[in-house]
């Protein structure tokens, strides 16, 4: 009820439950990675099923990935962008499990509506560095600074975040919704 409209059909209930589980696991993994050095690793239970069933595993009996496993893969990427909504602000963390620092990266953040149109300002941070084995906030802004003026657009748009190396190759990317899913 808090994050999604409660489905009426069983099949929809299973689907929404698996999507919500994936989001919850990703949220937890990102929080653990963000809180380094106090948390230096995370395992989740359980990887796979030993018979066909709807369960909390990340991989089903037939070897198919569930939403949880896709979200865990994203959250465990060696370099990960983690935007965090904190009250009326957004803080963008860069998380790195690499053993080498990364220099001269560019972080682009643009607000887009659900039709693909740019609706807010595009923010570009150049010469971003990500030290080895770190978690750090590289950008912080008030929500109203990111969204266009006028009507309540937080429900009608999202932010795309892309981290690129000096050759223009994408190192990491993610999206941030300004409002709850439902």
Pin down the residues of each PLM region.
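Short beta-strand/loop motifs in extracellular/secreted proteins, especially
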Residues: 103-107, 157
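Intrinsically disordered, low-complexity Pro/Gly/Ser/Thr-rich segments with frequent PxxP/GP/PP motifs
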Residues: 107, 115-153
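Residue-level signal for glycine
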Residues: 99, 116-117, 168
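Terminal connector regions
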Residues: 143-182
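Active-site proximal loops enriched in glycine and acidic residues that flank catalytic Cys/His/Asp
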Residues: 43-48, 94-96, 109-113, 123, ...
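Substrate-binding clefts and catalytic carboxylate motifs of secreted carbohydrate-active enzymes
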Residues: 1-103
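Extracellular and select intracellular beta-sandwich modules with Ser/Thr-enriched
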Residues: 105, 121-122, 170-174
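Buried hydrophobic-core signal for structured, non-transmembrane domains
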Residues: 90-96, 138-140, 159-163
């Amino acid at each position: 009820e808090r994050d999604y409209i409660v489905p009426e059909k069983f099949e929809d209930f299973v689907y929404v439950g698996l999507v919500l589980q994936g989001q919850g696991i990703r949220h937890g993994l990102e929080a653990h990675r963000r809180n380094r050095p106090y948390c230096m690793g995370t395992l989740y239970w359980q990887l796979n099923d030993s018979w066909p069933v709807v369960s909390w595993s990340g991989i089903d009996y037939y070897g198919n990935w569930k939403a949880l496993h896709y979200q865990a893969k994203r959250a465990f990427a060696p370099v990960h962008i983690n935007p965090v909504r904190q009250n009326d602000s957004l803080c963008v963390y860069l998380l790195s499990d690499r053993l080498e620092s990364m220099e001269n990266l560019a972080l682009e953040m643009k607000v887009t509506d659900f039709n693909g149109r740019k609706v807010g300002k595009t923010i570009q941070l150049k010469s971003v560095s990500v030290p080895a084995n770190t978690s750090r906030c590289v950008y912080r802004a008030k929500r109203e600074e990111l969204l266009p003026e006028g009507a309540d657009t937080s429900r009608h748009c999202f932010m795309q975040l892309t981290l690129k190396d000096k050759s223009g190759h994408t190192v990491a990317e993610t999206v941030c919704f300004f409002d709850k899913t439902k």
